[in-house]
Amino acid sequence: MILLHHLRVGRSIFCVWQLEELGLDYELKVYHRNPETFRAPPELKQVHPLGKSPVIEDGDIKLAESSAITTYLLERYDSEHRFWPQRKEIAAWAEFTQWLHYPEGSVFVPLI
């Protein structure tokens, strides 16, 4: 079963959404931000050296960063390509990749 380390008020909500859409069984480990600093709790550093969320554990694979997790989950669990185009459809795949990385590069930076 997949374990998702989920930080309240963060990007890991997109991973929860994806796990639900894919119909995968998963466990959600919820962490809360420090109310004064709004930083992640120190115990997240025990999960991953970056000390941030999201992080998934799937067997012996441990992976951080929401777009990396999205790509991994699609590659591993969506072989029918219900939610993303095949790489041989290069134009559609390139557009998908653009939108996959758009939030990190363009949306969230101005919001911080």
What are these regions (language model features)?
Residues 1-112:
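GST-like domain detector, emphasizing the conserved glutathione-binding G-site
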